[in-house]
Amino acid sequence: MKYFLDSAILEEIRYAYENWAIDGVTTNPRHIMNSGKPFLTVLDEFASEFKGVENFPISVEINPHLDNAKDMVEEGTKIAKLSSNFVIKIPCTEPGLIAAKEFEKQGISTNVTLVFSPSQALQPARIGAKFVSPFVGWKENSGDDTTQYIQDIVNIYKNYNYNTEIIVAALRNGKQIVDAAKAGAHIVTCGFDVYKESFQHAFTDYGLNKFRNAWDNTVTEAPVLK
């Protein structure tokens, strides 16, 4: 399974790339806002930081106010020219899907986002989108069981040998990462703190303290590993 970082903060991305071996980045307008920097400044930073780095997709979302395919294609084409790493992120609406089809014709990779059902996930795969992003956290917050919905998308894609990669998005904790892995999703994208939490466990800390105490009480005749 691939790990993408859901962030627009360069310091977080750099740390995760260097230390966690993340495979890509996803952004959205909210993450851009939280970075405290203008949209184009963030894109310029990304393009510079990862220039020459291959197979490291960075999903950049177009202006969410655009509501027709022509305008989406026009803006997305300009964004794609800024970096070979950029993937154009577009909403799963009818105009968005029409735009995605045109992008793929032009050889521009797309990430169809804001997907909340298997039926929505079908058309992105049919038109050859590079990625599709079904959301988990928002649905679970409303009381929905998301495990089966992700499994259904995975199974449908297998039935028809679709090449679109599934990015399970809006994850809130380590359990949701595991659920996505068990369902067979290709990728998860999480915030910095969610990954940090997923690397930890209370019993790991408990066991480490016990081993430290044992180490400190071990009598040795000579210093070890000086």
UniProtKB/Swiss-Prot annotation:
Reaction it catalyzes: 6-deoxy-6-sulfo-D-fructose + D-glyceraldehyde 3-phosphate = D-fructose 6-phosphate + (2S)-3-sulfolactaldehyde; 6-deoxy-6-sulfo-D-fructose + D-erythrose 4-phosphate = (2S)-3-sulfolactaldehyde + D-sedoheptulose 7-phosphate
GO BP annotations, alphabetical order: carbohydrate metabolic process
Keywords, in A-Z order: Carbohydrate metabolism, Schiff base, Transferase
EC top class, as a word: transferase
Single GO MF descriptor: transaldolase activity
Catalytic residues (UniProt): 89
Pfam families registered for this protein in UniProt: TAL_FSA (PF00923)
Domain of life: Bacteria
EC number: 2.2.1.14
InterPro entries: Aldolase_TIM, TAL/FSA, TSA/FSA_arc/bac
Subunit structure: Homodecamer; dimer of pentamers.
Family, per entry: Belongs to the transaldolase family.
Function: Part of the sulfo-TAL (or sulfo-SFT) pathway, a D-sulfoquinovose degradation pathway that produces sulfolactate (SL). Catalyzes the conversion of 6-deoxy-6-sulfo-D-fructose (SF) and glyceraldehyde 3-phosphate (GAP) into fructose-6-phosphate (F6P) and 3-sulfolactaldehyde (SLA). Can also catalyze the SF-cleavage with erythrose 4-phosphate (E4P) as acceptor, forming 3-sulfolactaldehyde (SLA) and sedoheptulose 7-phosphate (S7P).
Listed name of the protein: 6-deoxy-6-sulfo-D-fructose transaldolase
Species whose genome carries this gene: Priestia megaterium (strain ATCC 12872 / QMB1551) (Bacillus megaterium)
